[in-house]
C-alpha cells in the first residue's frame, strides 16, 4: 500500500513496474537452489525460519491468500503472518520460472516483448494478475 500511494522514499513509479515471478518449491529443489522460508515477516523477532519443505504447513496459507492485511481484535498477528517469505540464495535460473504476473495488459505486452527478444530462452507465460496488486 505504501508503494501504491507514494509513501516509499525515493520511489514514485507505483505498482505497474512490479512483476511477480512464479515457480514452485519442487522446481527450486530440482534446480538445487538453496532456500529458506518464514512463517511471517522476516524482521520480526518471533518469526520462525525453515529450510525444509516439510515445514511449509507452518505458513498460514489462507491468510497469505487473503486480500486484507490488517490485524484484528481477535488476531493481532495477521499482518506479520501475511508477510511470510520464500527466499532463494543468490538467484534463480530463468528456466525454473513457470509464470510471470503483471498489473495490466500494457505491462504484459512490455514483458512479453522483452522475453521474445531472447528466443533461445524459455518463453515464460505472462499473465495479468490484478488480484495480486492493491486496488
Regions found by a protein language model. Give the residues of each.
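Active-site-proximal loop/hinge segments that shape catalytic or ion-binding/gating pockets
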Residues: 1-135
Amino acid at each position: 500500500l505504501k508503494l501504491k500511494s507514494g509513501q516509499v522514499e525515493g520511489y514514485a513509479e507505483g505498482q505497474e513496474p512490479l512483476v511477480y515471478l512464479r515457480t514452485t518449491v519442487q522446481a527450486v529443489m530440482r534446480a538445487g537452489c538453496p532456500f529458506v522460508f518464514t512463517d511471517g515477516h522476516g524482521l520480526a523477532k518471533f518469526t520462525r525460519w525453515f529450510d525444509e519443505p516439510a515445514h511449509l504447513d507452518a505458513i498460514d496459507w489462507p491468510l497469505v491468500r487473503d486480500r486484507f492485511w490488517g490485524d484484528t481484535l481477535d488476531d493481532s498477528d495477521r499482518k506479520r503472518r501475511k508477510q511470510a517469505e520464500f527466499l532463494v540464495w543468490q538467484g534463480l535460473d530463468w528456466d525454473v520460472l513457470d509464470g510471470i504476473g503483471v498489473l495490466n495488459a500494457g505491462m504484459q505486452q512490455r514483458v512479453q516483448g522483452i522475453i521474445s527478444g531472447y528466443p533461445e530462452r524459455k518463453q515464460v507465460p505472462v499473465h495479468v494478475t490484478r488480484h495480486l496488486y492493491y486496488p
